[in-house]
Amino acid sequence: MKWKRLAFLATGLLFLAACAQGQKTNEKQPGGPLVRPKVTLHFASFGGSFQDDLDRAVIKPICREIGCDSQVDAYSGEYDHLAATIKNGTNPFDLVHVETRFLIQGGKGGLLAPINWKEVDENKLVPGAKNRFGVGLLAWSLVLAWNQSRLPAGTPPPSSWKDFFNIKKYPGPRALRNTPEGNIELALLADGVKPQDLYKNGLDVDRALRKLSTIKPYISWWTSGAELEQKLSTSCIMAAAWNGRVFNLKKAAQVPVAFTYDGSINQFDWWVIPANSAHKNLAMKFLAAFVNGQGQDTIAKNFGYGPVALKALGAIPPDLLEQLPSDPTNAKLGVPFDGEWWAQNEAAVEKRWNQWLLGH
Amino acid sequence: MRIPRLASPLLLIALALIGGWIAAWLLLPDEVAHLSFLVTIKLGIEVTALCLLLGSFPLYAALRQPKWPKLPHVLVAVSLGSLLIPTIARSLSLSALFSFYGPLATGLRVMRLWPQGQPLDSSHAAVVIALVTLYLPFTLLILSESMPSLGRMPDVAGTLGAGVLQTSLRVTIPRLLRPLATAGLVVFSQVLGVIITPRILGSEDVTLAVLIDDLLKRTMNTPEALRIAWAEMALAIPVAAVAAYFIEKERTARARPLQPALRFRGGRVLSVIPLVILAVVPGALLILSLGHSPILSMASLFQSGPTLEWFRRALLEPGFRRVLLPSFMVWMAAAAFSIFPALLVSVLILPYPQVRRSFRLLALVLLFVPQNALGVLLFMVLSRFPAAQASIPAWLLGGMGQAVPGFAFAFLLMDRVGDRLRRSLALASTLGASAWQRLLKVALPNLAPSVAAAFVATALITLDDIIFVRYLPRLPVNTAATELFGRARYGAAPDLAAACILMALFILLLVACGHIAREFPAIRRRLVASVGRPKVAAELGVEGAR
């Protein structure tokens, strides 16, 4: 009985304390100025250590500068979920980190608010980082990467996608991301299509799949950065890889990997503002400040992804810059990803891709 | 007379499969989905067959080791322990184990058992093996409930002159057909929803679950994804229903053997095989977490010795610490929404055996249907009620979603003591106990162990779920499972493996605490008996009373 009484007493005290706490937050400061609570901008990115750095180096300082609080949540690119919450009006985010795919589809579907390019200075951005519905967040490339310790003795390192398809010269498994985007392009480049002709008449998907079929038994598919890193370091001789992951393998894991920007497929990740964001103006202010380059060099140093702000690009040491996709020389070696073409054809290509994977 | 006994369950399975197959086929939208359906069925059959093979024979042998009477219990314990490892970590560790330049793949190539230059980790065989390590515990747990009831029957048949084939056909298989079918159907229905394992291993198998995920995430083709989710359910529900029906039948048919089984010659090695298989994943995970290399490499530990650095990092990592509170809140919400309704329902329907039976069947079906399709369908339903989605806190909504399988678990656990509880309540009532007394002194103490077990079960669901917490709330909840998933996306360091081991140890600790709490009255009685008796004897002046 003694314990029961004590438990009741403790519960009562906790309840009272909770009530008092609630009251405290609501009451006005007597005699002091009326402090208006800060607005909180709500961000969404892909989680993990990247999001931590993005928050620490970019989001928090900019929010401090424009006078708001920030909250960053992780999502795993569940665009269907994001689209559904925007459509039914329950989307909580003001700024979302998305890939080109969602930028184009979401923009066409009325899910995104147009960027006010009068407020956001496009001249501060690297070429290509501007879209009607998004501001570039980072630049990345799908590059040809290889593990130097797995190359046959005396064989020169691969230099183009043609070598990626050369099983005799470079025996061993190859890692490819399990999506048609990027793979169709690299297969066509390997099959002799010139970079400038790649999107000219639309991508020749069947030709690309025929080329990919020549190495199908040797392909190890990856879907996330972790798998790519693991495959390139322990399982595959080469990979079509996100440049940032190769950068990380070299820097953090000391794995003897190398890559080339020759024939790389250059893309951006984007900041977008959902159409029903509660703080569109403030989000726009954030983007206007973002293009000044605050903290983007940290992302470049830690993850190898290129800054989109020209100012940030200037602050990066040359030895690091030459490893980034934003470096003008590297950008020229690659092919810009055509998000528009993909947005129009993705559903059909995706079906054909799955059909090919299923052996037909 | 044997043929009808065999035919009835087989007929039921055939009807369920054919019915589900036709319904699913008609629901599927196009040729790609049909091809994916066939691939899924093939994968399901392969994994099921292997699980049955690797589960039934070794367990049969384990039950026939009089010198190792605890072996079947060890198998059950290891099976339960194996379920503590999150699927993401399991798949990553298997991927490291099967790596092309690793000892396993190299050995296979040297022996010419694997083609030169082709990856092992992303092969169809690797996916099948990974899924077998995932679902073998289910097979062992289901079979271990029924197989002991065989007792000495096969030995008696042998003594009476029946050969091995005759004994198998006339005694063993008819008796074990139902549990075998149940285990097979459960594994099969679970394989229909696999997505993380083929994805992480890098397989080109486009299963139905993978196709749904692609349609949702890549092309945002929600209507088509929904149709495929319905098709998956159309196939899974009849399968799960037949499995539930068999479990129900087996529950009532099960009997203790009159005499334990005789020794099975040469069965020791066979009985240890599942232990080895189930030890592979935790072993690989441990090796990965102890190595110095910052990537998941099996060779690292052997090249440069062990380190506990990754465990330290996992404990100190702000990312992991940040998700502790949300994970705890989601777990508590899931536990509350699982346990209280299950408790209420269990007590309310206690006097009605038919209703109890229906609830049991429903709970089993809920547990066995693929969770990916369930999550997608719940998401679609919830999207129609934006007000509810907006007003309920994210952690609560995520917990409520997890409570769907959690409720099923909790109800089944509580229902296990239903018959005993019913008798005890009737007895208490006869002795004049009031309703309040019956609840406090009879019902709750009887149900307490089940409540504790349900609490642990919800922890397991919370630690591995990324569907309900990501899809149901408008704002995703960052739990330990989603943190692992996010980290896997941006590079998996061995701290991820260490974090998974720590999570498994935490659950083990919970299980141990639950066990001690359950056994506490008995332990106290033993202590009192051992301390009290000499004291009483001394007081009475009786020497050598013990």
Residue ranges, per PLM feature:
Chain B
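Glycine-rich helix-loop "coupling/hinge" segments at transmembrane-helix boundaries
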Residues: V194-T222, M298-S304, D465-A493, V528-V531
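Juxtamembrane inter-helical linkers in multi-pass membrane proteins
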Residues: G158-T159, G163-T167, A253-L262, A299-P306
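Membrane-water interface segments at the C-terminal ends of transmembrane alpha-helices
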Residues: M1-P148, R175-I196, I228-A241, G266-S297, ...
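Membrane-helix interface/capping residues of multi-pass secondary transporters
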Residues: A33, M153, I195, T222, ...
